[in-house]
């Protein structure tokens, strides 16, 4: 599904099971880090306008300096202090190289199909990252008839969010519809379905302030109970499976946690090997 962390999982696989990122890839991510900073600032400003949150200082509504004008001397000390901050110095240094965590947290929309190959023991894995947005799905749904397993990612934290491409559609409802169509598709009749309910760290914080029942009235538990809310969404996906021969293997994940992903992917490998032995 869109905005679920698929690309982050693929990055983790490169870090855990491959040789990591080559210099050309790291340089590309360096540019993306800077782009994400600008995008984030723009989103904050747009959100303030949408929510009608005024700036504390009305003078910030219009720039006090026009192009070509020098900065007033009163800005010197604050800018000097900001520039001296170790984090800022690291990021904007000409020798700045993104760390693994920087790369994992970079955001760039996936378009088309991106393949990652890595070796795990005697096995060679080919993983395909596909765009999750509606416009991307028609490009890949028919391409994977013979895959060993489908790793389906959904952002469990998106239960109260709308789609990027459709502000009137709920992310979780959309993910449920997509999972239903893939799980029961003619292309994946004999394919193992591994479900990653991702961004569990964000979900844990969200339920404290955003009631699940507000968006899913059929939830009858405690809105702030982590175990009850996660179980509710896990069961929603599992119940969509219409085949008695097919198992759904759910996992709660945080795609930026390398140690957690290493452990979970060990379990996924066991599932895939078991499936292969069954098919012999």
Residue ranges of predicted features:
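P-loop NTPase motor core
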Residues: 8-96
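Switch II (G3) loop of P-loop NTPases
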Residues: 119-140, 158-162
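Switch I (effector-binding) loop of TRAFAC-class P-loop GTPase G-domains
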Residues: 20-39, 94-122, 136, 279
């Amino acid at each position: 599904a869109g905005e679920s962390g698929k690309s982050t999982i693929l990055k983790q696989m490169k870090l855990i099971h491959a040789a990591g990122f080559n210099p050309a890839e790291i340089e590309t991510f360096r540019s993306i880090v800077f782009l994400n900073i600008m995008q984030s600032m723009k989103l904050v400003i747009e959100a303030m306008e949408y929510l009608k949150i005024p700036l504390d200082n009305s003078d910030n509504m219009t720039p006090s300096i026009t192009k070509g004008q020098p900065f007033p001397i009163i800005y010197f000390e604050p800018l000097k202090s900001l520039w001296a901050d170790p984090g800022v110095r690291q990021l904007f240094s000409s020798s700045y190289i993104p760390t693994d965590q920087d790369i994992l947290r970079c955001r760039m929309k996936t378009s088309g199909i991106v393949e990652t190959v890595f070796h795990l023991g005697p096995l060679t894995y080919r993983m395909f990252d596909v765009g999750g947005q509606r416009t991307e799905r028609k490009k890949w749904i028919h391409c994977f008839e013979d895959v060993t397993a489908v790793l389906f990612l959904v952002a469990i934290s998106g239960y109260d969010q709308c789609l990027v491409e459709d502000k009137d559609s709920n992310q979780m409802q959309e993910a449920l519809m997509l999972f239903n169509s893939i799980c029961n598709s003619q292309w994946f009749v004999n394919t193992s379905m591994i479900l990653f309910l991702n961004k569990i760290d964000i979900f844990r914080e969200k339920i404290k302030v955003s009631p699940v029942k507000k968006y899913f009235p059929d939830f009858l538990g405690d809105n702030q109970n982590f175990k009850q809310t996660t179980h509710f969404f896990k069961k929603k996906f599992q119940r969509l499976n219409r085949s008695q021969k097919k198992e759904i293997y759910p996992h709660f994940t945080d795609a930026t946690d390398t140690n957690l992903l290493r452990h979970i992917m060990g379990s996924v490998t066991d599932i895939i090997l078991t499936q292969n032995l069954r098919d012999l």
